[in-house]
C-alpha cells in the first residue's frame, strides 16, 4: 500500500478559469506547487489569454509505478478534487512526468462524474479533441524566443553550438528545431547523466532512442 500526497493550488482567476499543469515527482511539495501556480497567473497575463493560474502535483516517483498504478493514481486524484475542477473553473494540463495519456485518464475520470467534459484538460490525445502540435509547442516556443532574441541583436543562429539541460518533452523538441535551423547541438543531459560530442549529436536518433525508454547516456555514443 502506498499513500501519496497530492495538491491542487488555485492562485488567481481574475482573468478567467484557473489553468495549470499536473506533475508527478518525488520532490513535489506544497511550496513548489504554490510558487508554480502563481507563475501560471503571470504567464497567462503576460500573453493576454483569458485564464488564471493554478498548479497540481502528486508526490510520487513514477518510475517505481506501473502504467496500471499511474492510471489508478490519476483517477483517484480526480475523484478527490473533481469539485474544484471544471471546463470553466480549473483546467489541467500535462507537466513533469505526465503526458497526453495522463490527461486522457483525467478527462475520463472527470467525465464519469460530471458527464462528457473534454475541455477539463488540455494536452489530451488528438483523437479525444486535443490540439495537433501540442506535444511540440513548448520546446518549439523556447526556440522561437531564442530566434527572436538573435534576430533583434542581428546574430546568426547557424553553426552556433548548443547545450541542452533536460531532454524530456521540452528539450527533445527544442533540440529538434535548433538542429533544423542550423545550430549544432553538442551536449544534452537528463536526470541520469549527460552526453557530449564536439561535432554535434545526431538529434533525430537520440530523440528516437529516448522515446523508446533509453536515457541519453544509453542512447548515443559520445564523451560523457
Give the residues covered by each predicted segment.
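Glycine-rich phosphate/diphosphate-binding loop of Rossmann-like nucleotide-binding domains
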Residues: 122, 130-224
Amino acid at each position: 500500500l502506498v499513500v501519496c500526497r497530492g495538491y491542487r493550488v488555485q492562485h488567481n482567476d481574475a482573468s478567467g478559469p484557473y489553468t495549470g499543469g499536473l506533475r508527478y515527482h518525488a520532490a513535489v511539495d506544497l511550496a513548489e506547487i504554490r510558487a508554480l501556480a502563481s507563475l501560471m497567473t503571470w504567464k497567462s497575463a503576460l500573453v493576454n489569454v483569458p485564464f488564471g493560474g493554478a498548479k497540481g502535483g502528486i508526490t510520487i516517483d513514477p518510475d517505481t509505478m506501473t502504467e496500471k498504478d499511474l492510471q489508478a493514481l490519476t483517477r483517484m486524484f480526480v475523484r478527490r478534487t473533481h469539485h474544484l475542477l471544471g471546463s470553466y473553473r480549473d483546467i489541467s494540463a500535462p507537466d513533469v512526468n505526465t503526458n497526453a495519456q495522463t490527461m486522457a485518464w483525467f478527462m475520463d475520470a472527470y467525465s464519469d462524474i460530471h458527464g462528457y467534459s473534454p475541455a477539463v484538460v488540455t494536452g489530451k490525445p488528438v483523437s479525444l479533441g486535443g490540439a495537433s502540435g501540442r506535444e511540440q509547442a513548448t520546446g518549439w516556443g523556447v526556440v522561437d524566443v531564442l530566434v527572436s532574441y538573435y534576430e533583434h541583436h542581428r546574430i546568426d543562429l547557424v553553426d552556433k553550438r548548443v547545450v541542452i539541460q533536460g531532454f524530456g518533452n521540452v528539450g527533445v523538441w527544442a533540440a529538434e528545431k535548433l538542429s533544423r535551423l542550423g545550430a549544432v547541438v553538442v551536449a544534452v543531459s537528463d536526470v541520469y547523466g549527460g552526453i557530449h560530442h564536439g561535432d554535434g549529436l545526431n538529434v533525430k536518433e537520440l530523440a528516437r532512442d529516448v522515446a523508446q525508454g533509453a536515457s541519453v547516456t544509453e542512447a548515443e555514443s559520445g564523451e560523457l
